[in-house]
């Protein structure tokens, strides 16, 4: 028997068993080996052809065929296997080598978007868009909010391809036609507008300062097609036709800020049945003026029954319009009046807002000059917060009626209101459930007037007094001092001296001048 032979290990078997019989009879094993070789192999580029200057390498004679043992049989591979693995180099258990050095290109768009979305810094995200055109397009897909300044960027369609996934669009600045050569001077209109540069001959009551209504309506139709998932929109000078087309294409719109609003436009607003937050600006003194009356408020209330927050700025109306809002919008929780032009008697309609939790009056020259009898006012039983900011509070009966309607509030904020004296502020005693009181910028209220109010608030837990110059530290009585001691939270900075002394504690800045002038004394 030859040394390369395979002896039969089974004595009961008559014929000897060799390796060739094992491979030929077991086809599954052969296929498994072939597939394993394919999986572990990798392709390499063929070597470059030799240059014509260099002589070809000498060919070595093929090695003589080796004499195989008589009982060992060579199994030829299939033609398909030979054709597939022609010019391959097989290295067992070697990692796959990528011929290109750009491993990021192997990532899918979804994976890279998830990585880029985890970056906390917005400036870092913007710089990433400069890496390549691919990253530039991906960065545009991550943007959710846009404020349009260049109207041509919108009308040309570039915004739709650059930012395909927007849910928040602000068209206010782009809707105003401003002068490009008057950059140094501007007209500031508050937080909503910011600075605008408008020529004196262009700025006129004929609305030549704004984009035409038909242009805005055509843009709204494009937005309805491009962004069906739009959730927030700020626009100016549109019509009910454009709003109705937007309502059909964007059924999930939840928040809208509508400038230059009037009764006719509110027919289109009523088409947004899922609207939850709405801000209507009817008139801004010196900029534009439009009419929002009880008719428009009634149309709005009947169409947008899911409103949670409503702000009326520069809007007219009366008892009927506010009552319609309270009866139809049962989910309304926050109501804001900014610079209102309401007729007398509207205050008693607030009692129809049964689920109202926050009432804000901002920049109001008056509240309600003729509120009516106390028994007709009613009350907002679930109201928790009352905020008065930059209002004129010099009418005692008007403020008293407001406190009667809001007598169940737990938080009261009075900021930068003029005309408020001790006698008028005394009506705050009607709100006996107040736990948090914040008074700021009320220069005519004295320490005595504050004491007469806070001592009647038996549930008071927190007090903030800021920039009220008629309140003095040395005027605090022992009773008021004991009340301060029992509060959970107290912030007492009635004048600028108190603010400055509090901010300079431990710095020593307030004493250096005194040492200097002592040296100059003779």
Predicted regions and their residues:
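N-terminal adaptor-interaction module of cullin-RING ubiquitin ligase components
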Residues: 1-285, 298-301, 319-323, 347-348
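C-terminal capping region of solenoid repeat domains
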Residues: 2-46, 50, 72, 178-180, ...
């Amino acid at each position: 028997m030859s040394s390369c032979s395979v002896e039969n290990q089974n004595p009961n078997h008559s014929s000897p068993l060799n390796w060739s019989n094992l491979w030929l009879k077991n086809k599954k094993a052969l296929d498994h080996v072939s597939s394993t070789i394919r999986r572990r192999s990798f392709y390499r580029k063929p070597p470059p052809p030799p240059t014509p200057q260099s002589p070809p390498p000498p060919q070595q004679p093929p090695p003589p065929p080796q004499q195989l043992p008589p009982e060992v049989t060579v199994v030829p591979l299939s033609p398909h296997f030979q054709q597939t693995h022609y010019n391959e180099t097989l290295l067992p258990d070697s990692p796959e080598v990528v011929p290109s050095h750009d491993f990021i290109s192997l990532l899918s768009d979804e994976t890279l978007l998830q990585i880029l979305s985890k970056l906390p810094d917005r400036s870092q995200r913007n710089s990433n868009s400069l890496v390549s055109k691919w990253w530039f397009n991906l960065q545009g897909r991550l943007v959710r909010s846009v404020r349009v300044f260049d109207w041509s960027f919108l009308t040309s369609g570039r915004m739709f391809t650059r930012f395909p996934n927007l849910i928040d669009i602000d068209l206010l600045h782009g809707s105003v036609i401003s002068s490009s050569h008057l950059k140094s001077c501007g007209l500031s209109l508050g937080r909503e507008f910011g600075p605008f540069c408008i020529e004196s001959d262009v700025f006129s009551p004929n609305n030549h300062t704004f984009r035409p209504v038909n242009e805005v309506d055509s843009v709204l139709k494009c937005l309805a097609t491009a962004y069906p998932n739009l959730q927030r929109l700020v626009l100016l000078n549109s019509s009910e036709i454009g709003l109705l087309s937007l309502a059909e294409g964007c059924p999930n719109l939840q928040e809208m800020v509508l400038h230059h609003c009037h009764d006719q436009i509110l027919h289109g607003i009523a088409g947004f049945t899922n609207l939850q937050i709405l801000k209507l600006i009817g008139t801004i003194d010196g900029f534009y003026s439009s009419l929002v009356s009880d008719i428009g408020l009634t149309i709005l209330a009947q169409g947008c029954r899911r409103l949670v927050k409503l702000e009326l700025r520069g809007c007219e109306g009366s008892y009927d319009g506010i009552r319609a809002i309270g009866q139809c919008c049962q989910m309304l929780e926050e109501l804001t009046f900014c610079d209102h032009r309401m007729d007398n008697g509207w205050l008693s309609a607030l009692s129809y807002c049964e689920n109202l939790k926050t009432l804000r009056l901002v920049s109001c020259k008056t509240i309600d000059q003729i509120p009516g009898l106390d028994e007709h006012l009613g009350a907002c039983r679930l109201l928790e917060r009352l905020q008065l900011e930059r209002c004129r509070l010099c009418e005692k009966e008007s403020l008293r009626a407001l406190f009667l309607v809001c007598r169940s509030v737990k938080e009261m904020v009075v900021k930068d209101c003029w005309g408020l004296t001790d006698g008028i502020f005394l009506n705050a005693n009607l709100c006996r459930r107040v736990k948090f009181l914040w008074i700021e910028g009320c220069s005519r209220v004295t320490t005595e007037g504050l004491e007469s109010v806070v001592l009647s608030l038996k549930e008071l837990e927190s007090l903030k007094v800021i920039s009220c110059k008629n309140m003095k530290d040395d005027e605090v009585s022992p009773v008021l001092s004991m009340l301060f001691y029992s509060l959970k939270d107290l912030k007492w900075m009635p004048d600028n001296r108190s603010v400055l002394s509090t901010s300079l504690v431990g710095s020593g800045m307030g004493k250096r001048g005194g040492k200097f002038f002592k040296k100059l004394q003779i």
